[in-house]
Amino acid sequence: MKVLLLGGTRDAINIAHSLLALNESGGQRIALIYSIAGIVRQPTINCAIHTGGFSQFSTGTASNPSQQGMKQFIQHNNIDKVVDATHPYAITISTNASTVCERLDIPFLKYVRPPWLVTDKDHWINVNNWAEAKKAMHPFKRPFVTIGRIANQDINAIPEHQFWTLRSAIEESQIQDQYSLIKAVGPFAEEQEIKLLQTHHIDVVVCKNSGGSAVDGKLSAARKLNLPVIMLNRPETDRAYGNHYDNEHDLIRAIR
């Protein structure tokens, strides 16, 4: 059986190792292709690795090159099943994969990482999109923004009364005096996050509900420092796919 695993997360790495371990148990052999955008870091997995997305395989003038390229890739590599373990906010790749699998009549299995849940010790301000997040940020002066890539136009439009601390990959900006960029890859321990929040005089944390079984360092740090958190809610498509699993063991059993 040939499986295409859409990755780029720690969950995907764990799933890949679990699938490869099945080959040593004497069951059905799995030929795994691990796909990653390749923006941040390359995984160390003993299987074929595809990097750079799928639009490179698109031909002609397709309206959706990524989707057409993925279809070409799946057909060319004789993929039997597609497993999506991308980030919960990676809507485009998940939608493309689900659509392609439906058209090719092959199984599509989606891993949905459990979201973080607010506690009575947290002060979350829930928002549905980036526009709402920016509006919620307005009363604060020193937000810590950890939502991923920030558009150049947003960096150039930081309100005069604010100084942003960013931990993300951003485009170049002509304005350099209203933000500081921290280039680092997690996970981050609570002690690290407390030190960062205090050093940069942060008064609000802005993040996505990426979720996971582990307690997030920045959320526990914000809780201890009594800081509010502007939480960008999960996309509505989070559980819109037919075969979705929030437990890795159930997912592995379904793939087998």
Model regions: which residues?
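Non-catalytic interface/targeting segments
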Residues: 1-36, 106, 110-183, 249-256
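Glycine-rich, highly charged phosphate/nucleotide-binding loops
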Residues: 47-74, 183-192
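A C-terminal functional module that forms or caps the active site or interfaces directly
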Residues: 177-225, 230-234
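Short acidic-hydrophobic, aromatic-tinged amphipathic segments that line or gate anion-handling sites
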Residues: 49-64, 123-131, 242-251
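Redox-cofactor binding/interface segments in oxidoreductases and associated redox assembly factors
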Residues: 83-84, 145, 207
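Helix C-cap/helix->beta junction micro-motif
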Residues: 26-28, 77, 104, 225
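Glycine/small-residue-rich loop that forms an oxyanion/phosphate-binding "nest" at active or ligand-binding sites
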Residues: 66-130
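Structural motif
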Residues: 78-81, 142, 203-204
